[in-house]
């Protein structure tokens, strides 16, 4: 799988560059746990269930070996500099990807960027996070409110919507757009990077279920704390592992989980 490949990549490059960047660690765990049939959230916050441990193990193993990017920022940054080569990110990130990699010595190399449906667990259902923002109006004059409605109807018209989203990396908003207009639009997309993204969209729409995060008053805090704590924990545990690998060659996967649970639950 993806994380086993990340470990192999680290062996190949002798631990100098992480193979994989995930823009949203919180989403990886959230969707991963839910895809295995268990709830990610409980009344107190995050539920550290058996499914959480299942999702944790391959991720932590790869991260502790150096195969997962644990610094801040978005995936587009290490991909532009060749510091990583694979990412899971928002579809709209395509606006920021570059087919030219610029290395630390200022040399450059052209690369091909290909989009694929989001990876899933072998024993889980095909589930993918749907993150999107709605559009709303504020109280105004009747004329402005009517103008806003006319604009939204125009923007979400299936044909117009496909013309718009295929320039920006967004998903169409109506089923008719997926069924009728997006397949037709593919033939006119000249950029192979964008074409592969929308081919992946069609496959995702056909084969996956979409997961939307629950409405919780503490959601933003849980997400912010989780992202920071998990990176800090794994960075610390990896540093300790590298320093003591001669005496303790076993990856501290479960020690890292215990430390993360303690830190996150404080």
Listing of model-derived features with the role each one plays in the protein:
Residues 1-45, 84:
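Extracytoplasmic/periplasmic solute-binding protein
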Residues 3-8, 73-87, 228, 232-235:
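Short helices/loops that flank or line small-molecule/ion binding pockets
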Residues 3-9, 42-72, 118:
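Glycine-centered hinge/linker elements that transmit conformational signals in sensory
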Residues 10-23, 157-167, 266:
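Bilobed periplasmic-binding protein-like "clamshell/Venus-flytrap" ligand-binding domains
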Residues 61-67, 104-177:
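Extracytoplasmic/periplasmic substrate-recognition and gating elements
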Residues 85-90, 95-97, 107:
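Paired acidic/hydrophobic, glycine-rich loop segments that form the ligand-binding mouth/hinge
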Residues 177-210:
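An extracytoplasmic/periplasmic, membrane-proximal ligand-sensing/linker region
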Residues 199-266:
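Conserved C-terminal helix/tail region of periplasmic/extracytoplasmic solute-binding proteins
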């Amino acid at each position: 799988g993806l994380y086993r490949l990340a470990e192999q990549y680290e062996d190949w490059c002798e631990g100098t560059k992480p193979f994989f960047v995930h823009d949203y660690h919180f989403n990886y765990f959230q969707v991963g746990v839910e895809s295995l049939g268990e709830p990610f959230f409980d009344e107190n916050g995050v539920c550290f269930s058996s499914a959480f441990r299942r999702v944790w193990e391959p991720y932590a193993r790869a991260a502790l070996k150096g195969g997962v990017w644990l610094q801040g920022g978005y995936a587009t940054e290490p991909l532009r500099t060749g510091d990583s080569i694979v990412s899971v990110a928002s579809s709209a990130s395509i606006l920021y990807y570059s087919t030219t990699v610029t290395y630390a010595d200022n040399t450059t190399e052209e690369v091909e960027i290909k989009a694929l449906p989001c990876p899933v667990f072998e024993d889980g259902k095909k589930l993918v996070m749907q993150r999107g923002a709605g559009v709303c109006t504020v109280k105004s004059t009747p004329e402005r409110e009517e103008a806003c409605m006319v604009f939204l109807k125009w923007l979400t018209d299936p044909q117009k919507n496909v013309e718009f989203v295929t320039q920006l990396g967004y998903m169409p908003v109506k089923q008719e757009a997926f069924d009728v207009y997006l397949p037709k639009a593919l033939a006119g997309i000249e950029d192979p990077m964008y074409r592969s993204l929308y081919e992946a969209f069609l496959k995702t729409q056909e084969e996956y279920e979409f997961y939307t995060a629950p409405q919780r008053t503490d959601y933003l805090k849980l997400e912010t704390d989780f992202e920071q704590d998990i990176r800090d924990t794994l960075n610390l545990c990896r540093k300790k592992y590298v320093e003591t690998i001669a005496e303790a060659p076993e990856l501290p996967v479960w020690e890292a989980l215990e430390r993360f649970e303690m830190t996150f639950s404080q």
